[in-house]
């Protein structure tokens, strides 16, 4: 079958032919319809330090997808041929304390689709049936293909009560923009997103944020004053991994504020911890999606009117995958969809 693989320990992704995966007793075989390119895939494409330490070569990559069930393991129940599915990209062990306690998103033995095992940038994918999620009929293939990153946004945004709160989102990448849209949709008062990329700030404006602030040109304190905010932000969603953005967030949080961190900062990032202590801030790390509460919330948010369509900016045939990666690497894109039909 046709697949996009990391064939060499150098920059690039290559189209190749690999054997169709075999279906185990507890697995589903999924015929891929559409995939989306993730920032992780760009890291793998660029063969950065993290990729060199993490990715086995050769490896079929990719973990954002929608497809159709075409094969079912003999022990699987609850699925039928033709079901339209996406799937949780974190494969968990099922045996550790967190898995057995229902906190599977915190499994210490997690492996990643398209990172530690073959991914979805292929005509067919095999995953455990436990990881598959049926897509409601009124959700399009395009939206279903970005459920994985949308789930990161939903998990982060819904970590805390947002109704009537003032929310700061640092980082206007696709996940940050989706998190801001979720916050506004569920009843936050002011949702302010910051970045230095004007293209992506404009995407955030299309998604309905209160203010999209280019911090290279505008002071966040001035924006807060303009909005009548006198006590700081109640909730912070840190999506950038940029130390200056996190420090600004700490400066502008209200006392007792709550911060959810999805962005990955440098390991040696320094902050003024007295601000965390004396403001009584609560900081929560976010990894992946809650299984499967986040997935149900994703579907419900879209069904209740949340419009994510502006975040999908580029669509290509998989044969034009290089154009898709070029768009992602340019910084002038939202989500990029590859069609396998």
From Swiss-Prot:
Pfam families listed in its UniProt record: ADH_N, ADH_zinc_N
GO biological process: L-threonine catabolic process to glycine
SS bonds (residue pairs): none
Keywords: Cytoplasm, Metal-binding, NAD, Oxidoreductase, Zinc
Positions that bind Zn(2+) 1: 38, 63-64
Quaternary context: Homotetramer.
Function as written in the Swiss-Prot or TrEMBL entry: Catalyzes the NAD(+)-dependent oxidation of L-threonine to 2-amino-3-ketobutyrate.
Protein's name according to its UniProt entry: L-threonine 3-dehydrogenase
Organism: Salmonella typhi
